[in-house]
A protein has these predicted regions:
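Short acidic low-complexity segments
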Residues: 48-61
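Rossmann-fold dehydrogenase core element
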Residues: 101-120, 135-139
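NAD(P)-binding Rossmann-fold cofactor-contacting core
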Residues: 22-43
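N-terminal Rossmann-fold NAD(P) dinucleotide-binding loop
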Residues: 12-13
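Extreme N-terminal starter segment of soluble prokaryotic enzymes
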Residues: 1-4
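N-terminal Rossmann-like NAD(P) cofactor-binding module of classical short-chain dehydrogenase/reductase
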Residues: 65-67
Length: 265
């Protein structure tokens, strides 16, 4: 099968390289990026580099499309691919919140919208718990100041993250609000809400913590199954916002698409 990759940042590059090295059950013949000049050295390092084209070109030449380009591109990718019966793997999960129209479009054309676990763990447990009923769900994200710089919520509220000397709560609300205020930082909260009790009932807290150098996510859920709690400390990549686990999760997710033995809910 041919995988089209839109976005050649940390995630896109990792997936393309894995395919080039024969680690995936996909070939990548086409990719798109807003900054082709920034990926020339990367493409030259590959044995079989994908052809750079635009969104339409990627969709036309691929069986499945992987979005790694930011929430602002998700709708356009879905509307181009889903009517052709082509499934879309979405990393910018926040862009799918309250987009029942895109889910309906996929259903109409017998395509799928797929969400890798990304930088979070425990989604299998949440999905299982949700089948029986979850009474409450909370998520707390701690990030070092560089990871939060430039976020719309930080800019609009004139929050000086560099001035903080201790862990400080800078946001409390729902995943829906969090993804609008921190579109490049907390896509994990959208994934957690999809797996659990939804974006309106899930409680979200974001903390700026100058004492850490990792992105830390903690999730707690309570229901008839009992109580679950999980925590992950992600090592950031060079762009500070994306954890290494995010691209590793994408690679494993793609492997699972043709795996004989599949583990997890």
């Amino acid at each position: 099968m041919d995988l089209g990759v839109i976005g050649l940042g940390v995630i896109g590059k990792a997936v393309v390289r894995a395919a080039d090295e024969g680690e995936l059950p996909f070939t990548v013949s086409a990719a798109a990026t807003r900054t082709p000049g920034n990926v020339r050295d990367f493409l030259n390092s590959l044995k079989n580099a994908p052809r750079l084209t635009d969104l339409a070109g990627v969709v036309a030449s691929s069986d499945v499309i992987l979005e790694a380009s930011g929430g602002h591109t998700v709708e356009a990718i879905c509307r181009a691919a889903l009517p052709l019966g082509k499934s879309v793997i979405v990393n910018s999960v926040g862009a799918l919140l309250e987009r029942e129209d895109l889910i309906a479009l996929a259903e109409k054309h017998k395509a799928r919208i797929m969400i890798p676990s990304g930088a979070i763990i425990g989604l299998d447990g949440l999905k299982g718990a949700a089948a029986g009923g979850i009474a409450s769900g909370t998520m707390t994200t701690r990030k070092p100041p560089p990871s939060l710089k430039g976020a719309p919520f930080v800019e609009e509220n004139n929050i000086d993250v560099d001035a903080m000397t201790e862990a400080t709560v800078i946001f409390e609300g729902s995943p829906l609000e969090a993804c609008k205020g921190f579109p490049a930082n907390v896509n994990v909260s959208a994934a957690v809400s999809f797996a659990g009790i939804g974006p309106h009932r899930t409680e979200m807290r974001i903390m700026c913590d100058p004492t850490i150098n990792r992105n830390i996510h903690e999730v707690e859920a309570v229901g008839e199954f009992g109580r679950l709690f999980f925590r992950i400390e992600n090592v950031p990549t060079e762009n500070h916002r994306t954890g290494i686990l995010t691209y590793l999760s994408n690679i494993q997710f793609l492997r699972q698409q043709t795996a004989t033995l599949v583990v997890g809910t």
